[in-house]
Amino acid sequence: MKKIILLMFSVLCVNSFSYVERSEQVGNRGLELIRESNINQNMGLSKESGSTQIIDAYGGNGKFSKTKGLMIGTTSNFVAYPNITAGVTVAYDKYKYKPDNSDYWGRNYDVNTYFSYKLDKNLFTLGFGYSQSRHVEKRGYIGNLEFGRFLTGNTYLYTGFEGQNRNYRNSEDLKFINYKVGVLRQDTWKKFKFLNGIEFNMDNKKYDREDRGRGNITFVSRASYYIYDDLLFDVQYRGTKNSKFYNNVVGLGFTHYF
């Protein structure tokens, strides 16, 4: 039954008609998956293998583009080294660039990998990513480094930075670093699980191409319902406030523990 539910959802996701600000969802969701996996260990919610799988369909509306997408991801502990967690996410997006005012939908493909090491109450996370876009002929390379500390078993405070190098075929490349600090908390109540977080982040320079401020406040709220003891249905909202715009993301998905 669980396999049938996941298969039906994945088919529906491909034809989703909702919209999203792709770059904010893809990178943040993977990092949250690593953080959440470590919080689950602290709270005793992980299953025997310590593995987590997700499938998400997400949608929203940003200032510069409308997109619709699907993401799958997984994390797992190393059997011999339970304090080490590795994860990977794969995302496919279709996006429509608003300033063009056309009906053309471009496509974007993303792969991100993450590794974390937990030492007592401290967590170190390293991430690498690759992104390719067909419409604007862009290749992106992403690196993440994060350090955090568990204030309690279910509350995680972190800081770090993300570097991006975007290579465009017919225009100038774009390189920047984004610095961040945030907090994430997870709670449970009966058959529900709640994840809430807020993050402050700032780029090291102002984009010349985009009408946006350097600083952002991003918050995420996810409510999950236990269909089975190892399968959850997720509803998510993500918002990003910039001095010149507000982007929002809505997502539906499933999480599976084993």
Regions from the PLM with identified roles:
Residues M1-E21:
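Classical Sec-dependent N-terminal signal peptides that target proteins to the secretory pathway
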Residues Y19-Y257:
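Transmembrane beta-barrel domains of bacterial outer-membrane proteins
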